[in-house]
Amino acid sequence: MAKQKFDRSKAHVNIGTIGHIDHGKTTLTAAICTYLAKKGGAKAMKYDEIDKAPEEKARGITINTAHVEYETENRHYAHVDCPGHADYVKNMITGAAQMDGAILVVAASDGPMPQTREHILLARQVGVPKMVVFLNKCDMVSDAEMQDLVEMEVRELLSSYGFDGDNTPVIRGSALKALEGDATWEAKIDELMASVDSYIPTPTRDTDKPFLLAVEDVMTITGRGTVVTGRVERGTLKLNDEVEIVGIHDTRKAVVTGMEMLRKTLDEVKAGDNAGILLRGIDRKDVERGQVLAKPGSIKPHKQFEAEIYALKKEEGGRHTPVLNGYRPQFYFRTTDVTGQITLDKGVEMINPGDNTKITVELISPIAVEEGSKFSIREGGRTVGAGTVTKVIK
């Protein structure tokens, strides 16, 4: 059978299932696909097909993630589900699977557990704007008061981490019963997807964001000027636009006098394009790898920030020993390494391999960073951790 063509005119949203181990994240993912397949909006997936998630690499870190896609009447979704807790942590911190929203799965039989809290905190730190709650295994908890209690607990937990606990939709259901085709519980999947459709905001498309290109290479074309090459991370750029060169040195302005991609000249480049940008009045020595070209005023160079990081385990190629206060590794942002010093959070004595925690970083030279910027932590050329900037200090 030919792969189903998805309707690209629908709004596209990236979501994922999060929550404590064995609360039913993968079963719910399978139930959503199987239910929507009946409506022609997905390919039915069995639990095992999702659970044997393939390995992928992001920022030098191996992560197991299952990707499924489906559509409702209003939207097209890419949905991620991770088999293990560590995969979630790595996924969220590296941004390997971008999440515009999440479905938090909580078993009514257990209530919120440690990983429930951790996933909510991580979602907050990495900027997931909203989530919908699926109270699972309600077929096993017939006492409505017990379900009410768990729901109240989840709402309070969401509020304590800065989400809108009062207005977050909470759907009570049974992923397993829905997957088995029980109509009563299938209706709950319908209710869940209606909530996801309405409550999780449609993200701003990358092309509508302010222009940014990470500089990979710089060359001179005799008689024409300096050409900067790299991938357009977001936004669009047109001929004769003004850009700023940000990071490492003082910020400078330049005018775009030419653009090309795959040896063809263009009038416009947009998010996702690998392009060469010709800049007027800029010397070869004025630009270097690691800087960015950006829409004027849209991003500033910073040296100090707070971040949420994950330290690789020894088996993942990470360090064998803990990191102490004052540790000075390289921080790899976009296309370059910059040395920086780590200050641990109050009360934290060390970071052990496999931990995820909050740190403060002071770089030796300023880099174009903003809240949500992703980076790798490297030592002697190998990746020992990954992080997300959660707050810029200076």
UniProtKB/Swiss-Prot annotation:
Mg(2+) binds at residue 26. The keyword Cytoplasm applies. The lineage of its organism: Bacteria, Bacillati, Mycoplasmatota, Mycoplasmoidales, Mycoplasmoidaceae. This is Elongation factor Tu. It is an enzyme of class 3 (hydrolase). Residues 174-176 are annotated as: G5. InterPro entries: EF-Tu_GTP-bd, EF-Tu_GTPase, EFTu-like_2, EFTU_2, G_TR_CS, P-loop_NTPase, Small_GTP-bd, T_Tr_GTP-bd_dom. PROSITE patterns: G_TR_1, G_TR_2. It comes from the Bacteria.
